[in-house]
């Protein structure tokens, strides 16, 4: 079998992996094999946590809406149900921002749905 000299291809591949892991500590950014493993692990975590980030923000918005709603003697569940029944289409992100930044507007929304 003839020898294959990969030339710059192998070096370019290794340098891309090492560039991806620059900033990692110790051998995880210096040695190719460990850097490759950590790079794959980091990409796996990034993929997983993109979904988790959406989940966490939704939980945060629901908590904020619930706290503001309970200050006005209505539960989160009843509030969301009333919004749908009155065909008021505000998503949880916007409701949470209104609840945090503009209490009067939030109270007005609650007055409309009661």
From Swiss-Prot:
PROSITE patterns: RIBOSOMAL_L20 (PS00937). It is found in: Plastid, Chloroplast. CDD domains: Ribosomal_L20. InterPro entries: Ribosomal_bL20, RIBOSOMAL_L20_CS, Ribosomal_protein_bL20_C. Keywords: Chloroplast, Plastid, Ribonucleoprotein, Ribosomal protein, RNA-binding, rRNA-binding. One of its GO terms (molecular function) is rRNA binding. Transmembrane segments: none annotated. GO terms for biological process: ribosomal large subunit assembly; translation. GO terms for cellular component: chloroplast; ribonucleoprotein complex; ribosome. Disulfide bonds: none annotated. Belongs to the bacterial ribosomal protein bL20 family. NCBIfam families: rplT_bact. Binds directly to 23S ribosomal RNA and is necessary for the in vitro assembly process of the 50S ribosomal subunit. It is not involved in the protein synthesizing functions of that subunit. This is Large ribosomal subunit protein bL20c. It comes from Psilotum nudum.
């Amino acid at each position: 079998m003839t020898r294959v000299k990969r030339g710059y291809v192998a070096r370019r591949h290794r340098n891309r992996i090492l560039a991806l892991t620059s900033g990692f500590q110790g051998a995880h950014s210096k040695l190719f094999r460990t850097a490759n493993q950590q790079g794959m692990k980091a990409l796996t975590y990034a993929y997983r946590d993109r979904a988790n980030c959406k989940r966490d923000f939704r939980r945060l918005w629901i908590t904020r809406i619930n706290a503001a709603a309970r200050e006005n003697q209505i539960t989160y569940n009843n509030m969301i149900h009333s919004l749908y029944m009155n065909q008021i289409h505000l998503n949880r992100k916007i409701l949470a921002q209104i609840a945090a930044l503009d209490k009067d507007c939030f109270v007005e929304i609650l007055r409309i749905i009661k």
